[in-house]
Amino acid sequence: MFTMKKSLLLFFFLGTISLSLCEQERGADEDDGVEITEEEVKRGLMDTVKNVAKNLAGHMLDKLKCKITGC
């Protein structure tokens, strides 16, 4: 029973250390988040283009509706 407790304690201790190291590594990766990736730039550009096209289409439909109804 005592050896089982020792092995469980050792297992818990080693697991805690490895978890701590993983969290430190993840924290280091998050600190490097200042750099903007090419994918983020593309995503931002596509969102902008999509919003402009959406607004332009809405404006054109409003003009067309106004011409049809005579407002």
Curated annotation (Swiss-Prot):
Disulfide bond annotation, renumbered to this chain: C66-C71
Coiled coil: none
One GO BP annotation of this record: defense response to Gram-negative bacterium
Localization annotation: Secreted
InterPro entries, per database record: Antimicrobial_frog_2 (IPR012521), Frog_antimicrobial_propeptide (IPR004275)
Keyword Transmembrane listed: no
Expression sites by tissue: Expressed by the skin glands.
Propeptide: 21-44
Signal peptide: 1-20
Main location: secreted
Keywords from the named record: Amphibian defense peptide, Antibiotic, Antimicrobial, Disulfide bond, Fungicide, Secreted, Signal
GO cellular component: extracellular region
Family to which the UniProt record says this protein belongs: Belongs to the frog skin active peptide (FSAP) family. Ranatuerin subfamily.
Chain's role: Antibacterial activity against Gram-positive bacterium S.aureus and Gram-negative bacterium E.coli. Has activity against C.albicans.
Protein's recorded name: Ranatuerin-2P
Organism: Lithobates pipiens (Northern leopard frog)
